[in-house]
Amino acid sequence: MQLYRGMDIGTAKLPPGEWRGLPHHLFDVLDVTDEAAVARYQPEARRVVQEIRERGSTPILVGGSGLYVSSVVFDFRFPGTDTALRARLEAELAAQGPGTLFQRLLARDPEAAKRIGSSNGRRIVRALEVAELTGAAVSGALPEEPKPWVPVRVLGLAAPREELVQRLDARVERMWAEGLLAEVEGLIPLGIERSVTARRAIGYAQALAELTGELTRSQAQAQTQRLTRRYARRQLSWFKRYPGIHWLDYDDPQLVAAALARL
């Protein structure tokens, strides 16, 4: 979601003043009305990686979405799309919500359904589209033994579960304290309410619901905290599959040195 211009507080986007002179790439490249798609992100991110390598520097890919990170790091291939099929599935999503489509995906591809979750309508639609186009489970598109696209070292930050939950909940409260509602109010004239991807982002969807009176402040924050914890669990499950990942203690006083020692 850091691809989107104006979505800063809810995505914890690092402000330019904290870049320490190091170039950061693929921030603020989409309007909130644009649809984010991993199949488009992959070639753009790989182009940036190649350019950095050609300059003799080491690119650092930070994530985030497990699928987006993996699409760059590993040899992922993405099936095409079918406009009519996509339109039919999206019409079902709009009319019935994600629940019915999720049950269909659960019956067809339990692994993908578990990974995507029952509330991510857009990804459920894409998974069903791939399944109908290819006749194969979308989880089959995820390599069981990933082969790196380029030589790569993968580092992960590990934290005790109880402490992680506390920090995630506190972060959601900070989002509101730092002005998430005002940020979302500013995005409404830019079209976030009619967007396909941006309006469904965790935190932004709940802030919109609070602004329209669908949720109270406490309900919006509680829902955001619950979805954030669920997303974090999926992230951990995803990255645990990475071969050779090096887990580092997030609160190690020598964290930077420990990370550099692994490179």
Swiss-Prot record:
Q: Keywords in alphabetical order, please.
A: ATP-binding, Magnesium, Nucleotide-binding, Transferase, tRNA processing
Site positions (Interaction with substrate tRNA)? S65, R86
One biological-process term from Gene Ontology? tRNA modification
EC numbers listed for it are 2.5.1.75
Q: What NCBIfam families does this protein map onto?
A: miaA (TIGR00174)
Q: Which family does it belong to?
A: Belongs to the IPP transferase family.
Q: What is this protein called?
A: tRNA dimethylallyltransferase
